[in-house]
Swiss-Prot record:
Highest rank taxon of the organism: Bacteria
Compartments reported by the entry: Periplasm
Keywords: Cell cycle, Cell division, Periplasm, Signal
HAMAP family, sorted: TolB
Endpoints of the signal sequence: 1-21
GO biological process: cell division; protein import
Alphabetical list of PANTHER family matching this protein: PROTEIN TOLB, PROTEIN TOLB HOMOLOG
Subunit-level organization: The Tol-Pal system is composed of five core proteins: the inner membrane proteins TolA, TolQ and TolR, the periplasmic protein TolB and the outer membrane protein Pal. They form a network linking the inner and outer membranes and the peptidoglycan layer.
Name of the protein in its database record: Tol-Pal system protein TolB
Known role: Part of the Tol-Pal system, which plays a role in outer membrane invagination during cell division and is important for maintaining outer membrane integrity.
A Pfam family this chain is assigned to: PD40
Amino acid sequence: MKILAKWLALAVLLCTMPAKAALDIVITEGVDAARPIAVMPFQWQGAGAPPQAIADVVMSDLIRSGTFKPLDELGLPQRGIGALAQFDASAWANVGAEAVVVGSVKPYGTDQFLVSFDLIDLVKAQNQALKGPTSATEFLMDSRQTVISAAQFRQYGHRISDIVYEKLTGIRGAFLTRISYVVVNHTQKAAYSLMIADYDGYNEQMLLRSPEPLMSPSWSPDGRRLAYVSFENKKAEIFVQDLYTQVRTKVSSFPGINGAPTFSPDGKSLAVTLSKDGQPEIYVIDIATKAAKRITNHYSIDTEPSWYPDGKSLLFTSERGGRPQLYRVDLNSGKVTRETFEGEWNLGGSITPDGRSMIFVNRTNGKFNIARMDLSTRFMQVLTSTRLDESPSVAPNGTMVIYGTTYQGKQVLAAVSTDGRFKARLPVGQGEVKSPSWSPFL
C-alpha cells in the first residue's frame, strides 16, 4: 500500500493550477535542427487591417510541431506575394527551404472572407529553374480557398497547418486538436478547475470547478466526452461529461478507489482502477449499463490502465514484481505479460496510436522522466531531462507528448516530440496545471 499511497498523493497533488486565457508556450530545445520552411504573410486585399494574421498561426503551429523551422521573412527573396502566379522560381534558387506557403485574404461579404493559399515545392521549383522555363503548376503541392468568418481565422490557420504538415511529412497534422487539464489555484475557494483548450492553449474553457480535487481527464474517441475523477462528494467518483450538452453521468461510485478512467477505442467502455473488492485492480465498465468486469486479480496493486489500439488488450501499472512496472493483459485470455524491465520504476504507460511505441514515465536514479519504447525492438529512449515528469498523453498523430512536470517549484505542462528533439514548456501565470490529456482528431 505504500506505493499506492505515493501514487494517490501524487494524483491529488496533480490537481492544483490557475485558469488563464491561454497557456504560454515556451520552446526550450530543438528548433535549430528542424526542417526550414518559408511562410509568407498572407496578402490582405481589403481596407484597414485583417481580423487576424493567419500566417502567424501557421508559423507558430509549424514551429511547435518540432519538425519545421520557418525562415525569417526579412531574408526571403520576394515580398507581398499571395499566389503561385506571383512566384518567381529563379529568385528562390538559393533559399535553403523545402517549401513556401503563400496566401491571400479578401472581404467576401458581411463578416465573410475568402482565404486562398498555395503550397509550393521549392526543391522542385529550384530544379526546374535550372532546366529552363516550365509550368509553375508542376511544383504546386496544394492550392485551396475557403470562405470563413472573422471568428474562424485562427481555426482555419490550424487547418492550413494540418494540410502543410501532412503534405510535407506524410503524417496527419494535429493542430486542430484540443487538450484537457486540471488547473489548481488555492487562492480561490473552488480551487480545482477542469479545463479544455486548443492544443496551443488558446480558446480555454472551464468545464467544471470544484473545491475538491479533480483529476485524470480522458477523452472519448469521438472527442465529444470527457471522463474524469471528482471528489466533489467527499469520495472518489468517475463521471463522463458530454462537452456539447454538458450532461454529466456518474459511471462509478464504488466504495474505495474509483480512478484512472480511460475510454475504449469504440467509446462504449471505460478501463478503470477500483478497490471495491480489496486491492486496487483493473476493471472494465460498460458505460451504458454501469456493469463492471474485473480484469486483473492479484494481491499487488494494479492501476493506470490504458488500451491498446485494437481494443483487445490493456496496458497497466503493477508492483506485482516488487516495483511498479508496466504489464499487458489480454482481455480474452486474461494472460498477463510484463512489458518493461529497464530502470527502477516504469509507470503511467500508453500505446501510441500506430501501435508501434509505448510512452511512459521511467524512474532511473531517482529521476522521473518521460520515455518511449519501440515495441518491436524493445529499445527504450528517455525523452526528457527534468526530474518530476508525470501523466504523459500522446497526440493523435503520435508525434508529440504532453505531460506534467515541475518548473521553478510549480506544476506546469510541457511537451516533447516522440524522437526527443523538440521540447517546450506551457506555463501559466497563477496556480499550477496538471493531468493533461490530448484529444483525438476532431
